[in-house]
């Protein structure tokens, strides 16, 4: 007699859905952080599956830095309208008043004020006690040691030495008033898993992930796309049309593209099978020695 076995992707899907349902049942006011990227798109798809045929029982929160790619914002608004979920968009008002820019103020200050502080403001404003995120352990070394339930203190800080053990699929959801957790249902997924699942489930993606001729300039070894007129060109710089795509998405001045011919999901998957570099190599903030990912997370970053 044949036994029905879960495929690798089905097992990952089942684990993620179980985590989402458990958080929705145990916490008073959860939220899903929606950055519009591939991992967020998979999270949204899983949430729709987890609570089907009902509506997703928590809102989605986008912390907008005012420097996201135009295509990301258009995609966000279109998806929110299509699937009718509650979308909250927060911009740090202090940062907006100060005119914080990655060009004028640098990547570290921009990330701290517009992302980290903006996120903490939104979590405090709405009183969320659990926040789903799309981080995966294979992305970066500080994320590799983070729990599925990542506990944060009353100031949203992460202490890697003060986390709770997770035995099998048993999670400790007890928090004191004012404390919260960040929940990572995709912890055990890899970048390749994400793309294979997107292909299997036919999930809509931001076009920036697919190769296309785009205007870019090379700065410090990164291909930066000229997305709007706010990007100041250095002396002698002339945008060049190159066939590029993005493996990861963030603020456009801080996100490097890669040269690629992958215009379809199968081609992207084939590219992933052959790549030997991290997807976050294109993130300028990860190369900022003054602000490592672990330090950012200890200050309240995603």
UniProtKB/Swiss-Prot annotation:
It catalyses: sulfate + ATP + H(+) = adenosine 5'-phosphosulfate + diphosphate. One of its GO terms (molecular function) is sulfate adenylyltransferase (ATP) activity. Its EC number is 2.7.7.4. CDD domains: Sulfate_adenylyltransferase_2 (cd23946). Pfam families: PAPS_reduct. Keywords: ATP-binding, Nucleotide-binding, Nucleotidyltransferase, Transferase. SUPFAM superfamilies: Adenine nucleotide alpha hydrolases-like (SSF52402). Pathway: Sulfur metabolism; hydrogen sulfide biosynthesis; sulfite from sulfate: step 1/3. One of its GO terms (biological process) is sulfate assimilation. Belongs to the PAPS reductase family. CysD subfamily. Heterodimer composed of CysD, the smaller subunit, and CysN. With CysN forms the ATP sulfurylase (ATPS) that catalyzes the adenylation of sulfate producing adenosine 5'-phosphosulfate (APS) and diphosphate, the first enzymatic step in sulfur assimilation pathway. APS synthesis involves the formation of a high-energy phosphoric-sulfuric acid anhydride bond driven by GTP hydrolysis by CysN coupled to ATP hydrolysis by CysD. This is Sulfate adenylyltransferase subunit 2. It comes from Psychromonas ingrahamii (strain DSM 17664 / CCUG 51855 / 37). The lineage of its organism: Bacteria, Pseudomonadati, Pseudomonadota, Gammaproteobacteria, Alteromonadales.
């Amino acid at each position: 007699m044949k036994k029905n076995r879960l495929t690798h992707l089905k097992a990952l899907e089942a684990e993620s859905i179980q985590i989402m349902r458990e958080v929705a049942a145990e916490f008073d006011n959860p939220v899903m952080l929606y950055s519009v990227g591939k991992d967020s798109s998979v999270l949204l798809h899983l949430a729709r599956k987890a609570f089907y045929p009902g509506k997703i029982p928590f809102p989605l929160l986008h912390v907008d830095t005012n420097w996201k790619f135009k295509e990301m914002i258009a995609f966000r608004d279109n998806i929110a309208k299509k699937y009718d979920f509650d979308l909250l968009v927060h911009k740090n008002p202090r940062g907006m008043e100060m005119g914080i820019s990655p060009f004028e103020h640098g990547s570290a200050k921009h990330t701290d004020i517009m992302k980290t502080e903006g996120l903490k403001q939104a979590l405090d404003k709405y009183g969320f006690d659990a926040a789903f995120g799309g981080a995966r352990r294979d992305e970066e070394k500080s994320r590799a040691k983070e729990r599925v339930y990542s506990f944060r203190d009353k100031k949203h800080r992460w202490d890697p030495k003060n986390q709770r053990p997770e035995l099998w699929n048993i999670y400790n959801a007890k928090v004191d008033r004012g404390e919260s957790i960040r929940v990572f249902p995709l912890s055990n997924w890899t970048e390749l898993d994400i793309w294979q699942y997107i292909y299997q489930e036919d999930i809509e993606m931001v076009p920036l992930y697919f190769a296309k001729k785009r205007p870019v300039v090379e700065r410090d070894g990164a291909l930066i796309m000229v997305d709007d007129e706010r990007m100041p060109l250095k002396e002698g710089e002339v945008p060049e049309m190159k066939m590029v795509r993005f493996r990861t998405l963030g603020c456009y001045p801080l996100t490097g593209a890669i040269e690629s011919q992958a215009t379809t999901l199968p081609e992207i998957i084939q590219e992933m099978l052959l790549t030997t570099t991290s997807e976050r190599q294109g993130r300028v903030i990860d190369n900022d020695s003054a602000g490592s990912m672990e330090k950012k997370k200890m200050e309240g970053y995603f």
